Amino acid sequence: MKTKREDIRNIAIIAHVDHGKTTLVDELLKQSGVFRENQEVAERVMDSNDIERERGITILSKNTAVHYKGTKINIIDTPGHADFGGEVERVLKMVNGVVLVVDAFEGAMPQTKFVLKKALELDLPVIVCINKIDRPEARPTEVIDEVLELFLELDASEEQLDCPFVYASAKSGYAMVELDDEHKDMQPLFETIVNYIPAPEGDPDADIQLLISTIDYNEYVGRIGIGKIDNGTLKVNQEVMMVNAHDPEKQKRVKINKLYEFDGLAKVEVNEATIGAIVAVSGIADIHIGDTICSVDNPVAIPFQKISEPTIAM
């Protein structure tokens, strides 16, 4: 039977380069207690590729998770470029809503249009976070109008147009629901995420279905497949069937050596995970994006979004 995982929210962050996405995620991590007070935060937690740190762009989507009052919020970064079409779509299939981060002075930029369009097409609810609200030249009211115009241009539904706005200064560590609210902390953004973004749902007792949406690599364990559990429960040492994305007849029996969930900036080993969890599995040498981890008795693949090759010239 389908049930909701009320203790989880899976969100993607969409933002233009330099609109403060990484500072925002740093601040959410900091205020949810991931970093100790005296710990140096390497600014820009999400950009772990060197190219990305240098250019401030996100190519491989990154995963972090924060906890707020008993709810785990998995935060997935999205590539900001239309050049990464397939990846954007696959990342968005892992989440139940998005946070669009917009600079309070610059407003909505063309670069976010592509990812936002995909999110709206997938019928995902959007929270708009107007960031850098403390800039002297901030013009939040006009920026809201611009964002809503962009939504209309991208054929947003009435529900999507009725989205919540949150004003923030990630750098100063506060968010507000109304412009004249007190400057306290990030709680208004946490609350909006938990209350507005739906919980993931699935059938924990059904056969396992986990679509691999991204691949990570580690020299000790090799290829690591990352995705969201749509149905069923996955356990360490479980025998599963890996079904090939391009050829569902191609199936391979494999064993789950290690299973991880995300916590803060780390992958944490777990013995089992169930619906709604974003997990990483290791020990499968030839695992690829788009493969589905299924039960041996009932290997049903999840339809796969083909990846378009990156066209960005470095």
Predicted regions and their residues:
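Structural and coupling elements of P-loop NTPases
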Residues: 1-314
